């Protein structure tokens, strides 16, 4: 261990002697050195670097000489770490191997339940069997022109199935003919059944970027590897999040008798699905020690809000706070009104709405009440996730319509999931949410039973004509109702306003969109809710939440510009009363629509029955592409390998997640056998004043973790400027040792042209890591043998160059760690 404590590393001793030979004030330096040595193993804070102050005058900032400058590989590594990890490492406390083993086993059990359920759904059975979960395609189900994926060759176009006589037989056999970029291939039918996958979902016609080549499968192998690595990173990140979630403990909430009184206020008879959802959430809160993460998937108006209200009451009645997060201020205001009314019998429970409608003084007052715990239920939009909102004792997060939040908001929501109970409400869950629910990583309750009085919405899909629009609006107004008229962009609202004012001169018409002044928007929505405005021309700001019983016709223009989930939510704005509701979906001209847009619209027409939001989301998963499962890409890595092979690789990775685990070794057990003793320039020693203490701080940071070492280096450079080359060598050795520890390497040494790394990693993990490497130079030079990773260099390198090689090579290996579980 590189330290000035007893039993110092032999590499450090010459360095100490060399440092002592430089000319800082001798008495001050020796006093500092003695004081530092007495500190034994106490860990000094990183800020000590920036708090050191010299008693003598010194330059305001150290500047290295130009000849010492070198391309800064440490900064490049730090940038990559910050990009890959963000603040995740600091947000998740360390977990030892034994503890990780227990939680991985728990997650595996959950996975098996989820995968069995998925398998049953895919096979159209109620219970899952024990057979293999396969996504391979039946060649007879293919149509000429369909894109297919051969696992070993790549992407081709299916031509057909024909009989042909093989060379060594007189009996004709059935062959599958597939067209590739450089020729035609024929496969025996039995072989094709084992190796062929669909590139697209049925009825989908997305074109791949290129067809594969029969004469060169290396490009296909690279694409497959890229897809596999991307999947590994998805699975590992998911696994780590849930490992840490399982690790969190909280006392179960008490089963308070007043819960029954609160539930009795519900004015309707609960449906069987609702009753089950109530029970599921109650068990999560009162019988489990692990924080809840449950998805309530229910169609519009099926009673999801009541489930949330009961969860909120359970939590806040114990003195904790609840946050209700909505994607728009309109929906947030509606939640606030519903919650305020429901909790009016409990004056000690304070409800607040934080929104842009408030004055600065009102916001400041609310922020203070949240911080001190005087506000029990906080309702609002993404502003609730801001750094200025500090919660006193947050116990529950309710998220409504998660699919409408942006990337950063979703990441913030995810960060809450490791510490508080989370309840997500959605009529059309985003694919990622649905996927987690189906695979057992997340619990889900499905409310698919409509209230007895609900009538299905009648959906009309046709090309746009003004006469049809006028007729639809007139029919609704004649029965005393109101109309939503929705457009995808603000730009077209004025034109529609002019058209409707001309067609209905005596009717009150208004516009609503997100760019309006807050009070103007609020006033418009309030007047529409009161029935004073008969036609509301708007953008999809009304997509979620508006509960207006008298509005039973919605007209959506340019439907091709909306997502399927958006259309389903917009359609759900009507049909909440006992009248038959109508949704008119208008497109400009079918010839202008993409195949995907047409598929989206036909899916919506198919799901006319009530309670089909869950099935619709499954269709949406296929139409939008599975890149959205784990992130925000619309196509994701599915395009590399096709939908079915991507699925198979995903589930294979999920089912073998324990093989993605790497066992790190303690930092102080790592040996770097390289005799290198850099001499620090006297000016730098003078400037640092106490270099020994700073080196000790660097060692302690490296011993803790990579994130701490990175922060130390950045703090050092922020305070003193870029270090000289000799100090960079010292830092690089610390980085090499830290990266080796993370990778499970306990010793690195060189013998002639051969560099050897002794490791505890398995051959499978080594292959996963090298597959992830982007630099061919290092990847091709590494081989795995026994318990060693070896690299043969072209020539024997001088010591400093050898250290640089180790640094670069380990940096490449370390970059693969996000694709591995590090416990």
Swiss-Prot record:
Pfam families: CarD_TRCF_RID, DEAD, Helicase_C. The keyword Thylakoid does not apply. It is an enzyme of class 3 (hydrolase). The keyword Transferase does not apply. ATP binds at residues 298-305. It is found in: Plastid, Chloroplast. Gene3D superfamilies: 2.40.10.170, P-loop containing nucleotide triphosphate hydrolases, Transcription-repair-coupling factor, D7 domain. GO terms for molecular function: ATP binding; ATP hydrolysis activity; DNA binding; helicase activity. Residues 465-622 form the Helicase C-terminal domain. Keywords: ATP-binding, Chloroplast, DNA-binding, Helicase, Hydrolase, Nucleotide-binding, Plastid, Transit peptide. Residues 285-447 form the Helicase ATP-binding domain. It comes from the Eukaryota. Belongs to the helicase family. This is ATP-dependent DNA helicase At3g02060, chloroplastic.
């Amino acid at each position: 261990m590189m330290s000035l404590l007893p039993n110092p590393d032999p590499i450090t001793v010459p360095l100490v002697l060399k440092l002592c030979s430089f000319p800082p004030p001798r008495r001050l330096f020796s006093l500092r050195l003695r004081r530092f040595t007495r500190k034994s193993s106490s860990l000094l804070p990183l800020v000590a670097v920036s708090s050191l102050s010299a008693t003598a005058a010194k330059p305001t900032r150290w500047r290295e000489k130009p000849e010492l400058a070198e391309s800064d590989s440490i900064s490049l590594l730090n940038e990559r770490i910050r990009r890959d990890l963000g603040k995740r490492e600091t947000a998740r406390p360390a977990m030892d191997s034994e503890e990780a083993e227990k939680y991985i086993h728990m997650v595996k059990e959950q996975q098996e339940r989820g995968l069995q359920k998925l398998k049953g759904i895919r096979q159209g059975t109620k219970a899952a069997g024990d057979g293999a979960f396969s996504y391979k395609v039946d060649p007879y189900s293919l149509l000429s022109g369909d894109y297919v994926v051969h696992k070993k060759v790549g992407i081709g176009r299916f031509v057909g199935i024909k009989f042909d006589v093989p060379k060594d037989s007189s009996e004709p056999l059935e062959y599958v003919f597939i067209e590739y970029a450089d020729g035609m291939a024929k496969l025996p039918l039995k072989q094709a059944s084992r190796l062929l996958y669909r590139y697209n979902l049925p009825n989908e016609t997305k074109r791949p970027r290129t067809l594969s080549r029969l004469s060169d499968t290396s490009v296909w192998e690279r694409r497959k590897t890229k897809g596999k690595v991307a999947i590994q990173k998805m699975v590992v990140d998911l696994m780590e999040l849930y490992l840490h979630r399982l690790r969190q403990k909280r006392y179960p909430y008490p089963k308070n008798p007043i819960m029954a009184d609160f539930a009795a206020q519900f004015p309707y008879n609960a449906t069987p699905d609702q009753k089950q959802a109530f029970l599921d959430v109650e068990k999560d809160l009162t019988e489990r020690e692990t924080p809840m993460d449950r998805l309530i998937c229910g169609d519009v108006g099926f009673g999801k809000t009541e489930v949330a209200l009961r969860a909120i009451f359970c939590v806040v009645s114990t003195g904790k706070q609840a946050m209700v997060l909505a994607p728009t201020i309109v929906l947030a205001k509606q939640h606030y009104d519903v919650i305020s009314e429901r909790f009016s019998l409990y004056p000690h429970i304070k409800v607040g709405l934080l929104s842009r409608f408030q004055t600065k003084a009102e916001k400041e007052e609310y922020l203070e009440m949240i911080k001190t715990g005087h506000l029990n239920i906080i309702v609002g939009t993404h502003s609730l996730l801001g750094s200025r909102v500090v919660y006193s004792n947050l116990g529950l997060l309710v998220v409504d319509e998660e699919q409408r939040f942006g990337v950063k908001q979703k990441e913030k929501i995810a960060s809450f999931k490791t510490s508080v109970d989370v309840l997500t409400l959605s009529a059309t869950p985003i694919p990622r949410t649905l996927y987690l629910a189906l695979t057992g990583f997340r619990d889900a309750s499905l409310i698919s039973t409509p209230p007895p009085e609900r009538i299905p919405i009648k959906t009309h899909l046709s090309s746009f004509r003004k006469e049809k629009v006028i007729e639809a609006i007139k029919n609704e107004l004649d029965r005393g109702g109101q109309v939503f008229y929705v457009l995808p962009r603000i730009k077209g609202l004025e034109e529609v306003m002019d058209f409707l004012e001309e067609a209905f001169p005596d009717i009150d018409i208004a516009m609503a969109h997100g760019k309006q002044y807050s009070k103007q928007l609020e006033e418009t929505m309030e007047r529409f809710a009161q029935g004073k405005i008969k036609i509301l021309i708007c953008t999809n700001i009304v997509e979620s939440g508006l509960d207006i019983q008298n509005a039973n016709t919605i007209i959506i223009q340019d439907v091709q510009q909306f997502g399927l989930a958006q259309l389903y939510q917009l359609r759900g704005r009507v049909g909440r009363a006992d009248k038959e509701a109508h949704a008119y979906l208008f497109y400009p001209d079918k010839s202008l629509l993409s195949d995907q847009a047409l598929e989206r619209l036909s899916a919506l027409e198919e799901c006319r029955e009530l309670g089909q939001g869950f099935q619709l989301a499954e269709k949406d998963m296929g139409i939008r592409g599975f890149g959205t499962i784990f992130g925000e890409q619309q196509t994701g890595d599915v395009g590399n390998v096709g939908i079915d092979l991507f699925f198979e690789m995903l589930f294979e990775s999920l089912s073998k997640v324990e093989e993605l685990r790497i066992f790190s070794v303690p930092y102080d057990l790592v040996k770097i056998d390289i005799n290198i003793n850099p001499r620090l320039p006297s000016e730098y020693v003078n400037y640092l004043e106490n270099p020994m203490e700073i080196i000790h701080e660097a060692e302690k940071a490296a011993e803790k973790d990579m994130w701490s070492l990175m922060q130390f280096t950045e703090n050092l450079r922020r305070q003193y400027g870029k270090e000289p080359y000799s100090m960079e060598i010292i830092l690089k050795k610390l980085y090499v040792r830290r990266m080796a520890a993370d990778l499970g390497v306990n010793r690195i040494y060189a013998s002639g042209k051969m560099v050897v790394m002794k490791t505890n990693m398995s051959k499978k993990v080594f292959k996963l890591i090298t597959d992830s490497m982007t630099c061919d130079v290092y990847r091709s030079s590494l081989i795995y043998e026994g318990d060693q990773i070896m690299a043969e260099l072209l020539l024997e390198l001088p010591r400093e160059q050898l250290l640089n090689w180790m640094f670069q090579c380990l940096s490449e290996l370390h970059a693969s760690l996000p694709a591995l579980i590090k416990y």
